[in-house]
Amino acid sequence: MRRAHSERVWWAPAILAGLVGCGNPSPSGDAGPDDHTAIDAGPSTDTGADARPSTDATPETDATVNSDAGPSMDVTVSPDASPPMDATVTPDASPSADAGTSADAGTSADAGTSADAGTSADAGTSADAGPLRPTFPFGGHRQRFTVGTIAPTGTTVALDEAAASFYRAWKTMYLRPGCEAGTFYVSTAGATSGATVSEAHGYGMIIAVLAAGLDPEARAIFDGMHAFYLQHPSERSPVLMAWNQNAACMSINGRTTATDGDLDIAYALLLADRQWGSDGAVNYAAAARRIIEAILRFEIHPTGQSPMLADWGAPPNRYAGTLRTSDTMPDHFRAFRAFTGEARWGLVLDTALFHVDALQTGFSRRMDGTLTGLVPDFATGADTAIPRPAAAGWYEGANDGNFTYIAARVPWRLGVDYLSAGDPRALTPLRRLNTWAREVSAGDPARIVGGYTLVGTALTGAPAREMVVLAPLAVAAMAEADNQRWLDALWGAIVARPITAERYLGNTVKLLSMFALSRNTFAP
């Protein structure tokens, strides 16, 4: 079903709609997108290989919805007893589990104190939860990163506090209690509207895990978001989440899925298992296994081994070979392979990295022979040997084959994977993107706009300083030391951008990127 985007956007369908490019209500008949209204996130001032996949698990029963408003979400940061480790990277003798060599975060006497937000009777754990302290607390910098990667210039304390400060603002603006006590969701409309989508839910669950050690409510929030996910199953694949809910916590616009949301929810559950263990109120590992198996069964192309748009998108659907490039999540596919032992996830990983390279080398070449590294929002033919940019109007609108708010997330997804895995197949496309971005901007992030053709021509009317573009480029710039000045300029632009200047999507991608930029991420 095709999303009908809000008119309050620039030049075309969606870059500032603050929305997911993943509205996927269930198709009727031939399975293309149906007409429906997309959620407009609004500004913050809106007071508003073909192994047989595993059989899906039995879905949980929908929980009864009531009107409890849930707890307040305010957070105050206070010093933690245990100091964090400095973000300076030093080589570690042991390589990472998958590819490349990792670097230990090291130690520093002046690293300051980890932010352990506020006070809480249960120290941030849900009832019957496991250990009181997370394994990878915010500010602890315990993840080893690939040798040669960099961070913005500045003290660890300053980077941490910038990320922590924006987390507090983001939480106040977007985190909302669900209709049943103890449940939570991320509002896609800013301060007051209750509408949400599964993409936002996946982002929010990852954010909650990464905020452990900063926010004493992090685990309770995560478990509440997990409960909200369970209350909104897809009709076709009940272990997966229906893509769209309204303020009354009812699934709307077709109870089908959006693949990117499910991928992030599954990954968040693996992170939670690593962060807190699975012996508490929620068995995160078991929940992750169920959803990973369902994704492989319903949302990965059976022969093309690439993510489909949704659980309705399998062959013979006309969109079966359509790739939403923001679904390129190599760190997720890598983690799913390691966790399940399912070889097919290795094929999905290989296919994803191949598709990025094929789109860059085949379609981003300029007249002088150099590559911009830009990829389209949507590609067709992902179920065949070589994908190609979607034609205008193929799925969402006129810019389906251009680089806008969907493809803008690819540098972030590739970047976080390279930070932890060091896979050279991610580094090569990152180098292309970094070279192009430094050149087109002349080192000034304000010269980067929100949309381009694949050969680097700015789209008419595309605004500057968009966080959905700049924040992912900053994560990409972490890949190599020769990007340091460019990375520092991007970091300055990111920190300076007020939350009121962006909508849900830009602010949420900004926060997730700031966790990576301050080295407050980890791999499952």
Residues of each region from the PLM?
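Sec-dependent bacterial lipoprotein signal peptides
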Residues: 1-20
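Extended ligand-binding clefts on enzyme/binding-domain cores
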Residues: 131-166, 194-199, 237-242, 254-260, ...
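Active-site-adjacent structural elements in enzyme catalytic domains
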Residues: 220-231, 253, 267-271, 283-296
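Solenoid-like repeat scaffolds
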Residues: 492-501
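Internal amphipathic alpha-helical repeat/solenoid segments
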Residues: 152-200, 208-222, 226-254
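Short glycine/serine- and small hydrophobic-enriched flexible loop segments
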Residues: 205-213, 264-275, 331-335, 412-419, ...
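Non-catalytic accessory regions flanking glycosidase/transglycosidase catalytic cores in CAZymes
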Residues: 50, 56, 62, 74, ...
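Ser/Thr-rich, Pro/Gly/Ala-heavy low-complexity intrinsically disordered linkers and tails
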Residues: 21-130
